[in-house]
């Protein structure tokens, strides 16, 4: 198969699968993207330019990796499937422009949730410059990865992530919607959320049961003032612990004293019978400020 045919095309993906006896591993949430328009759409959404430093999570057989490299990015990829490095080494272009592949691409066999980013990236990336994350995320670890990236101390320019459509809807949710919850609030206090692209489930091999969305997360320039982020996230989760109950009922565990609880609800300017999904992010921040950190 001529290598001028993109890895992400259905034809070349099938050739690679046959050549290396690849089987998508359900336990790793593997679904290979075979829609070249979607792949190029991800690269465009990530606004990739020559010289950009990109962390890719789960490169698979290299469908997205190839296009990131061709767009001029320097790519550091995390992968947990030890059967894939051989494929990436053989199938990715040997040269990108005038540079050999090893100057522009580095693969680390490691779970990104166990990554020490600064240690891993040292010597390959210029750590004084911002980093972009681009990934087709396995559905089963989407939320932990988003939290891990949001809470890391790396200087991120943006995170462009393909994920289950349902998760994307939770990320961009507004107060009053059923999708609004702890994930929404945790992410929106750190990042601007934009859904850039919808990807049909037919764009994957094997075909998942659900559609996907490509979401671009950009760090907020003016983040809300949260004194203790770990405490804030815990308070939000506690407020949503019994979603159908009123705010007053959910706060009983956090503020046993009824007078103090009533005073806080009055300060928030809300009805005690309001449910947590109707509160704004600013109101959750105020609740956390009034509950002592443990």
Swiss-Prot record:
Its EC number is 2.1.1.182. It holds the Pfam family RrnaAD. It is an enzyme of class 2 (transferase). Its main location: cytoplasm. One of its GO terms (molecular function) is RNA binding. GO terms for cellular component: cytosol. It is found in: Cytoplasm. S-adenosyl-L-methionine binds at residues 31, 33, 58, 79, 111, 136. Keywords: Cytoplasm, Methyltransferase, RNA-binding, rRNA processing, S-adenosyl-L-methionine, Transferase. PROSITE patterns: RRNA_A_DIMETH (PS01131), SAM_RNA_A_N6_MT (PS51689). InterPro entries: KsgA/Erm (IPR001737), rRNA_Ade_diMease-like_C (IPR023165), rRNA_Ade_Mease_Trfase_CS (IPR020596), rRNA_Ade_methylase_Trfase_N (IPR020598), rRNA_adenine_dimethylase (IPR011530), SAM-dependent_MTases_sf (IPR029063). It catalyses: adenosine(1518)/adenosine(1519) in 16S rRNA + 4 S-adenosyl-L-methionine = N(6)-dimethyladenosine(1518)/N(6)-dimethyladenosine(1519) in 16S rRNA + 4 S-adenosyl-L-homocysteine + 4 H(+). Belongs to the class I-like SAM-binding methyltransferase superfamily. rRNA adenine N(6)-methyltransferase family. RsmA subfamily. PANTHER family: DIMETHYLADENOSINE TRANSFERASE, DIMETHYLADENOSINE TRANSFERASE-RELATED. NCBIfam families: ksgA. Specifically dimethylates two adjacent adenosines (A1518 and A1519) in the loop of a conserved hairpin near the 3'-end of 16S rRNA in the 30S particle. May play a critical role in biogenesis of 30S subunits. This is Ribosomal RNA small subunit methyltransferase A. It comes from Lactobacillus helveticus (strain DPC 4571). The gene is rsmA.
